From Swiss-Prot:
Lineage: Eukaryota, Fungi, Dikarya, Ascomycota, Saccharomycotina
Miscellaneous comment text of the record: Present with 3180 molecules/cell in log phase SD medium.
Record carries keyword Repeat: no
Originating gene: RRP43
InterPro entries linked to this entry: ExoRNase_PH_dom1 (IPR001247), Exosome_comp_Rrp42_subfam (IPR050590), PNPase/RNase_PH_dom_sf (IPR027408), Ribosomal_Su5_D2-typ_SF (IPR020568)
Effect of residue 246 to T: Interaction with RRP46 abolished
Positions of modified residues (N-acetylalanine): 2
Gene Ontology annotations for the cellular component aspect, listed alphabetically: cytoplasm; cytoplasmic exosome (RNase complex); exosome (RNase complex); nuclear exosome (RNase complex); nucleolus; nucleoplasm; nucleus
Function recorded in the entry: Non-catalytic component of the RNA exosome complex which has 3'->5' exoribonuclease activity and participates in a multitude of cellular RNA processing and degradation events. In the nucleus, the RNA exosome complex is involved in proper maturation of stable RNA species such as rRNA, snRNA and snoRNA, in the elimination of RNA processing by-products and non-coding 'pervasive' transcripts, such as antisense RNA species and cryptic unstable transcripts (CUTs), and of mRNAs with processing defects, thereby limiting or excluding their export to the cytoplasm.
Gene3D superfamilies xref list: GHMP Kinase, N-terminal domain
Name by which UniProt lists this protein: Exosome complex component RRP43
Modified residues (Phosphoserine): 26
UniProt-annotated location(s): Cytoplasm; Nucleus, Nucleolus
Subunit structure and binding partners: Component of the RNA exosome complex. Specifically part of the catalytically inactive RNA exosome core complex (Exo-9) which may associate with the catalytic subunits RRP6 and DIS3 in cytoplasmic- and nuclear-specific RNA exosome complex forms. Exo-9 is formed by a hexameric base ring of RNase PH domain-containing subunits and a cap ring consisting of CSL4, RRP4 and RRP40. Interacts with NIP7 and NOP8. Interacts strongly with RRP46.
Amino acid sequence: MAESTTLETIEIHPITFPPEVLARISPELSLQRHLSLGIRPCLRKYEEFRDVAIENNTLSRYADAGNIDTKNNILGSNVLKSGKTIVITSITGGIIEETSAAIKDLDDFGEEELFEVTKEEDIIANYASVYPVVEVERGRVGACTDEEMTISQKLHDSILHSRILPKKALKVKAGVRSANEDGTFSVLYPDELEDDTLNETNLKMKRKWSYVLYAKIVVLSRTGPVFDLCWNSLMYALQSVKLPRAFIDERASDLRMTIRTRGRSATIRETYEIICDQTKSVPLMINAKNIAFASNYGIVELDPECQLQNSDNSEEEEVDIDMDKLNTVLIADLDTEAEETSIHSTISILAAPSGNYKQLTLVGGGAKITPEMIKRSLLLSRVRADDLSTRFNI
């Protein structure tokens, strides 16, 4: 006797994902769906930038001109907010001794003449850079990532080759602290003396010192590429830097230190203890005309298969799709995970408000980068740089 079998009916229901979940599961599909509607996953237009809000010099020791925080070692700072991302930049400094005198600092006429002949050989040697450390907070601890090290190195190299920070702006014009007859101390600085003879006689030293600047850049709530945000925040912070004045004690200016080499020969070397003034400072003199601001762009091809179609006319629209024709669009100011992971062809530009361009980086890995796209991105970068330059207000 055959046993009766019952067939169970299985119903399959379509699963609907929220936009943020779909962006995680299939970022490329999420991006194409949004682009087919003429908007981006962040609900901005193709060439629309995020709004930027900044706060300058609020973390510095010189934030309050009437009350200097002597326990604070930050010389300049900036807090930049772009969309949901916050970038905090703080600049500190130190003083180093120049181990070898520059050719132009020597008194010998022959060496000076040699410098004049060879000075055009390497112009970049007349400029310095900042030593940045980028930290992208992700709620974990550990060693720095490859991305953080790459961005830090790129920031250092870009500042150097943009010729923003001349070495002469970092020269320490050391003063001399002397004791007065009433027991008080006073400090004389070379640029504050009216008598040039007294300046050359008493304050001329063979030892040379220079300031060195360090930048710590912390990125919070990262939602996309961060190099342009770090660069712009660093530009704002550099414009607010004030360098503390430095001096040496008059009683220590004539000290000599004996250095023995292998116990046989001895050389006499001057020794100084250089001290930073707690109250006096000078602004950092940078090349304002070379200040540039960063912007990034992405090129993506619209996929007809991923477009949202009207259910009433789905058959007609399927016939009209031409797979050989792929429209390419330019996306400004990449944001969200869907755009960062799905767009492989990118353009990164450093543009000055004056119209000069300091850096252009093209990365091709997906859509074709056409000359029209490059021209459009250069134009947008100039407009963006002009807008960001007006936001700086100390």
